[in-house]
């Protein structure tokens, strides 16, 4: 049986803003996939490790270069999708974390679409957006 991909928003940085669903999926999944930029900073990992014991999980780092080169980005997205599909083919459920919400300018949306197009199951899981968190911090509404 194939696994399923979950593209999970982890909020704007405060680990207390992870949704209950995000925490549950991170605890239950077989693999945690995380975007990795061109340096050693891994903000998403730093956030989730404060809430979930991720060292016990299989981790997959997906390189997402910071570039305007569309070809390079498309290759990175396809490579990420291919790596996740290998996990899904082995029956593993994968959570691909993204800062904020996957429905608002998120890295994982491209991988999500490629995985769906390849015939696999993938679900978007909303997270708290930065603009909503800022409004709350300012004690105002949008």
Each language-model region and where it sits:
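Short gly/pro/ser/thr-enriched loop/turn and capping motifs at secondary-structure boundaries
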Residues: 39-41, 67, 129-132
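Glycine-rich phosphate/diphosphate-binding loops that line cofactor/substrate pockets in enzymes
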Residues: 1, 25-28, 82-92
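N-terminal glycine-rich phosphate/adenylate-binding segment common to multiple enzyme folds
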Residues: 79-84, 92-108, 112
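General beta-strand structural signal in soluble alpha/beta enzymes
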Residues: 34, 61, 96-98, 124-127
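Short, hinge-like loop/turn segments at secondary-structure boundaries
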Residues: 50-52, 78, 139-142
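Glycine-rich, flexible N-terminal cofactor/catalytic loop recognition
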Residues: 1-64
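Glycine-rich, highly charged phosphate/nucleotide-binding loops
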Residues: 13, 73-85
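Class I SAM-dependent methyltransferase SAM-binding "motif I" and its flanking Rossmann-like core
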Residues: 100-142
């Amino acid at each position: 049986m194939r696994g399923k991909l979950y593209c999970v928003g982890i909020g704007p940085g405060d680990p207390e803003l992870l949704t209950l669903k995000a925490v549950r999926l991170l605890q239950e999944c077989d693999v945690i996939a995380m975007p990795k930029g061109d340096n050693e900073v891994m903000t998403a990992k730093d956030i989730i490790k404060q809430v979930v014991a991720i060292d016990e999980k299989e981790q997959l780092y997906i390189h997402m270069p910071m570039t305007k080169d569309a070809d390079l980005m498309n290759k990175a997205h396809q490579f990420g999708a291919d790596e996740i599909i290998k996990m899904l083919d082995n029956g593993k459920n994968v959570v691909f974390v993204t800062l904020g919400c996957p429905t608002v300018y998120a890295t994982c949306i491209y991988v999500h679409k490629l995985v769906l197009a390849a015939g696999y199951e993938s679900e978007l899981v909303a997270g708290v957006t930065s603009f909503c968190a800022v409004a709350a911090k300012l004690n105002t509404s949008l």
